[in-house]
């Protein structure tokens, strides 16, 4: 095999140098405060966790980092009904009759949102769906057909007893879903949303007795779904009993594949003898 010309080696070294600079830029963006991700990065994930685990706190941060859409399926369903879309009208008929909205309607609502919501171009955070293995399978089928498979299924885990103390002090901004806590994460001004200045509310079902029933239902539903995503290899747990900043750092570690990228880069450079 003929040796490479000096000019070819120099060109290759320059390419490698540019690659290393690009990797360093990406690492810098992902480190520290977890600023906005590079334009080539996207996120496609499910954010799981019992009520009060912190989904309403972390989802907006993920959305901001990736410029993605946050699809809280309960809010999305209510919006479709209010807008009287075809899917919304169909769902309203079912709910008015006391029935449960079918998996097909929910998956189609998500599909419609992904196709028409410009915020979803850089990815999505699904919150509140799927709740069953059947729903997970149908969601995966739809996403596979649109060539947008899930990358992460992150579960925020926390002790039920701690949740009770958390939720009984929870405050919510109805329009955005942003959540606060009277003690652990208070708004800057009492009972006022930090972003809009609009009033916060305390949900009527945020009481200990109701919460215990909701938690029992959540655990019964979620265990099989967690097992499903464990098998696919995309499930990751996070200790949600930590303060919100630490939970965010744990999320960044999941999103950050810089160690793998850097490792592969270094290995390649060593193999071709261009890294001293």
From Swiss-Prot:
<feature type="binding site">
    <location>
        <position position="170"/>
    </location>
    <ligand>
        <name>ATP</name>
    </ligand>
</feature>
<keyword id="KW-0547">Nucleotide-binding</keyword>
<comment type="function">
    <text>Catalyzes the reversible transfer of the terminal phosphate group between ATP and AMP. Plays an important role in cellular energy homeostasis and in adenine nucleotide metabolism. Adenylate kinase activity is critical for regulation of the phosphate utilization and the AMP de novo biosynthesis pathways.</text>
</comment>
<dbReference type="Pfam" id="PF05191">
    <property type="entry name" value="ADK_lid"/>
</dbReference>
<dbReference type="GO" id="GO:0005829">
    <property type="term" value="C:cytosol"/>
</dbReference>
<feature type="binding site">
    <location>
        <position position="135"/>
    </location>
    <ligand>
        <name>AMP</name>
    </ligand>
</feature>
<dbReference type="GO" id="GO:0046033">
    <property type="term" value="P:AMP metabolic process"/>
</dbReference>
<dbReference type="InterPro" id="IPR028587">
    <property type="entry name" value="AK2"/>
</dbReference>
<dbReference type="InterPro" id="IPR033690">
    <property type="entry name" value="Adenylat_kinase_CS"/>
</dbReference>
<keyword id="KW-0963">Cytoplasm</keyword>
<dbReference type="InterPro" id="IPR006259">
    <property type="entry name" value="Adenyl_kin_sub"/>
</dbReference>
<keyword id="KW-0496">Mitochondrion</keyword>
<keyword id="KW-0418">Kinase</keyword>
<comment type="subunit">
    <text>Monomer.</text>
</comment>
<dbReference type="InterPro" id="IPR007862">
    <property type="entry name" value="Adenylate_kinase_lid-dom"/>
</dbReference>
<feature type="binding site">
    <location>
        <begin position="128"/>
        <end position="131"/>
    </location>
    <ligand>
        <name>AMP</name>
    </ligand>
</feature>
<dbReference type="GO" id="GO:0005524">
    <property type="term" value="F:ATP binding"/>
</dbReference>
<feature type="region of interest" description="LID">
    <location>
        <begin position="169"/>
        <end position="206"/>
    </location>
</feature>
<dbReference type="InterPro" id="IPR000850">
    <property type="entry name" value="Adenylat/UMP-CMP_kin"/>
</dbReference>
<feature type="binding site">
    <location>
        <position position="203"/>
    </location>
    <ligand>
        <name>AMP</name>
    </ligand>
</feature>
<keyword id="KW-0808">Transferase</keyword>
<dbReference type="Pfam" id="PF00406">
    <property type="entry name" value="ADK"/>
</dbReference>
<dbReference type="GO" id="GO:0006172">
    <property type="term" value="P:ADP biosynthetic process"/>
</dbReference>
<dbReference type="InterPro" id="IPR027417">
    <property type="entry name" value="P-loop_NTPase"/>
</dbReference>
<dbReference type="GO" id="GO:0004017">
    <property type="term" value="F:adenylate kinase activity"/>
</dbReference>
<feature type="binding site">
    <location>
        <position position="242"/>
    </location>
    <ligand>
        <name>ATP</name>
    </ligand>
</feature>
<feature type="binding site">
    <location>
        <position position="78"/>
    </location>
    <ligand>
        <name>AMP</name>
    </ligand>
</feature>
<feature type="binding site">
    <location>
        <begin position="52"/>
        <end position="57"/>
    </location>
    <ligand>
        <name>ATP</name>
    </ligand>
</feature>
<keyword id="KW-0067">ATP-binding</keyword>
<feature type="region of interest" description="NMP">
    <location>
        <begin position="72"/>
        <end position="101"/>
    </location>
</feature>
<dbReference type="GO" id="GO:0005758">
    <property type="term" value="C:mitochondrial intermembrane space"/>
</dbReference>
<feature type="binding site">
    <location>
        <begin position="179"/>
        <end position="180"/>
    </location>
    <ligand>
        <name>ATP</name>
    </ligand>
</feature>
<feature type="binding site">
    <location>
        <begin position="99"/>
        <end position="101"/>
    </location>
    <ligand>
        <name>AMP</name>
    </ligand>
</feature>
<protein>
    <recommendedName>
        <fullName>Adenylate kinase</fullName>
        <ecNumber>2.7.4.3</ecNumber>
    </recommendedName>
</protein>
<feature type="binding site">
    <location>
        <position position="214"/>
    </location>
    <ligand>
        <name>AMP</name>
    </ligand>
</feature>
<comment type="similarity">
    <text>Belongs to the adenylate kinase family. AK2 subfamily.</text>
</comment>
<feature type="binding site">
    <location>
        <position position="73"/>
    </location>
    <ligand>
        <name>AMP</name>
    </ligand>
</feature>
<dbReference type="GO" id="GO:0046034">
    <property type="term" value="P:ATP metabolic process"/>
</dbReference>
